[in-house]
């Protein structure tokens, strides 16, 4: 068995894996234990009461977090004409059609999000084997295939997170940085949970949000007592 580092021993001593923590206590604990030499992200894992084997119970979507994610997002937009000008005005770093596709084919992908207008999907469709495995393929379900590309760019820049359950029915995403104020992390988490509950499949029965855990990039998961979150969640 691998020897635990001093840091991991400290984390194990501080975090009670059998306990659900008050949200404020959970955030304070994450901040205390975030001792990496870089600014760690705060991630969340939400266990959903779904059967991920059934396509009609899978959960996928996007929501804008009120305080963003703390990341500078570079956006590429496939579109043309007036939409191209609107995308540039909204802050997109790369805008084009075949010329942008050529960059992608060359491996020049200096962007984090790809957005496309419906008329551009004939070009984007050729890039599925490149963009798909990287999680960059535009999709109408998460608002990245849209006639209103300017709004989509603004949402991406404002801290929109995309979510999709894995094969175990768990949503993994980021809700900010460890340098955020505690209230900012709490409000971002609450906004995500509100969005998830709105996306609950009609065929999912019983408790929908079964467990919520938050962690930092290099830290352990801390389970959150959902009763300590806002009443709107």
Swiss-Prot record:
The keyword Translocase does not apply. It comes from the Bacteria. GO terms for biological process: regulation of translation; translation. Disulfide bonds: none annotated. Pfam families: Ribosomal_L1. Keywords: Repressor, Ribonucleoprotein, Ribosomal protein, RNA-binding, rRNA-binding, Translation regulation, tRNA-binding. The keyword tRNA-binding applies. GO terms for molecular function: rRNA binding; structural constituent of ribosome; tRNA binding. One of its GO terms (cellular component) is cytosolic large ribosomal subunit. PROSITE patterns: RIBOSOMAL_L1 (PS01199). Gene3D superfamilies: 3.30.190.20, 3.40.50.790. Binds directly to 23S rRNA. The L1 stalk is quite mobile in the ribosome, and is involved in E site tRNA release. Protein L1 is also a translational repressor protein, it controls the translation of the L11 operon by binding to its mRNA. Belongs to the universal ribosomal protein uL1 family. Part of the 50S ribosomal subunit. This is Large ribosomal subunit protein uL1. It comes from Vibrio cholerae serotype O1 (strain ATCC 39315 / El Tor Inaba N16961). The gene is rplA.
């Amino acid at each position: 068995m691998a020897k635990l580092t001093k840091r991991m021993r400290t984390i194990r001593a501080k975090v009670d894996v059998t306990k659900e923590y008050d949200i404020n206590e959970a955030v304070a604990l994450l901040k205390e234990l975030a001792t990496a030499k870089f600014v760690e992200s705060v991630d969340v894992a939400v266990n959903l009461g779904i059967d991920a084997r059934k396509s009609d119970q899978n959960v996928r979507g996007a929501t804008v977090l009120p305080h963003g994610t703390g990341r500078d997002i570079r956006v590429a937009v496939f579109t043309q004409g007036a939409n191209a000008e609107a995308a540039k005005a909204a802050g997109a770093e790369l805008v084009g059609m075949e010329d942008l596709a050529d960059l992608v084919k060359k491996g020049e992908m200096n962007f984090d999000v790809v957005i496309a207008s419906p008329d551009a999907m004939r070009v984007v469709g050729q890039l599925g084997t490149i963009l798909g495995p990287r999680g960059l393929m535009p999709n109408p379900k998460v608002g990245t295939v849209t006639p209103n590309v300017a709004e989509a760019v603004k949402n991406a820049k404002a801290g929109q997170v995309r979510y999709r359950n894995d094969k175990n029915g768990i949503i993994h995403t980021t809700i900010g940085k460890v340098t955020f104020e505690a209230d900012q992390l709490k409000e971002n988490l609450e906004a995500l949970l509100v969005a998830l509950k709105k996306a609950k499949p009609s065929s999912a029965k019983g408790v929908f949000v079964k467990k919520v855990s938050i962690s930092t990039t290099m830290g352990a998961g801390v389970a959150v007592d959902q009763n300590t979150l806002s009443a709107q969640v």
